[in-house]
């Protein structure tokens, strides 16, 4: 069995960027309006899913909190606590302790994105922390919010463009997990980069 793990995205991205910057043939550009694809390839991670609010999404918001007193069992995490208001959807809370006084707590929904009451994340988290976990004194260190499409976005195939990540169908639709699949896809692309147009990606 593999232990459940969490990765600090900021540290992960910085490690990768620092590694890439060691290569003199790699350049970083921002705010590019036009890209010439005639003699190059584009690896695109931006999907067309944003306009599909009526489809099924896993959307969430989480806070990393720190408490004054010992409030968590740092050897046990609660992956899905369904003892909460479902509002005719699927709703659960997630608690991942880092120590006895620090934890990440998330509210997660599986639904469309049309209901304002479902995305009232701040009140959901406040009520859960104070009423369910019975923690009154805490401070928020970090906050995150996101939405993962539980459907494959229908991107229009373009010449010399490879869809990667969620845009490339790497999200596991049953769970929303994507990270491991992205690593495998990246390895495949790297292995076949010299002959990428003849691979099964196209």
PLM segments and residue spans:
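An active-site-proximal "capping" alpha-helix that borders the catalytic cofactor pocket
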Residues: 125-130, 178-196
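Aromatic-anchored, charged helix-turn/loop surface patch used as a conserved interaction hotspot
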Residues: 57, 173-177
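Dinucleotide-binding Rossmann-like beta1-alpha1 core, especially the glycine-rich loop
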Residues: 1-19
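Predominantly flavin-linked oxidoreductase catalytic cores and closely associated redox partners
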Residues: 14-139, 149-157
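Short FAD-binding loop at a beta-strand-to-alpha-helix junction that anchors the flavin cofactor
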Residues: 95, 100-102, 158-174
């Amino acid at each position: 069995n593999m232990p459940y793990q969490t990765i600090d995205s900021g540290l992960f991205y910085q490690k990768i960027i620092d590694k890439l910057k060691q290569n003199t043939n790699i350049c970083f550009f921002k705010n590019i309006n036009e890209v010439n694809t005639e003699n190059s390839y584009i690896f695109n991670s931006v999907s067309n899913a944003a306009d599909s609010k009526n489809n099924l999404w896993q959307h969430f918001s989480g806070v990393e909190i720190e408490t004054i007193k010992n409030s968590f069992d740092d050897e046990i995490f609660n992956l899905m606590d369904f003892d909460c208001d479902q509002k005719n959807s699927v709703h659960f809370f997630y608690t991942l302790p880092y120590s006895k006084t620090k934890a990440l707590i998330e509210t997660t929904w599986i639904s469309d994105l049309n209901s304002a009451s479902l995305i009232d994340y701040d009140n959901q988290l406040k009520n859960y922390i104070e009423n369910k976990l019975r923690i009154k004194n805490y401070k928020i260190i970090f906050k995150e919010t996101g939405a993962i499409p539980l459907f494959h976005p229908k991107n229009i195939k373009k010449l010399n463009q490879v869809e990667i990540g969620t845009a490339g169908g790497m999200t596991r639709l049953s769970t929303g997990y994507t990270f491991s699949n992205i690593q495998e896809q990246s390895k495949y692309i790297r292995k076949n980069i010299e002959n990428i147009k003849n691979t099964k990606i196209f």
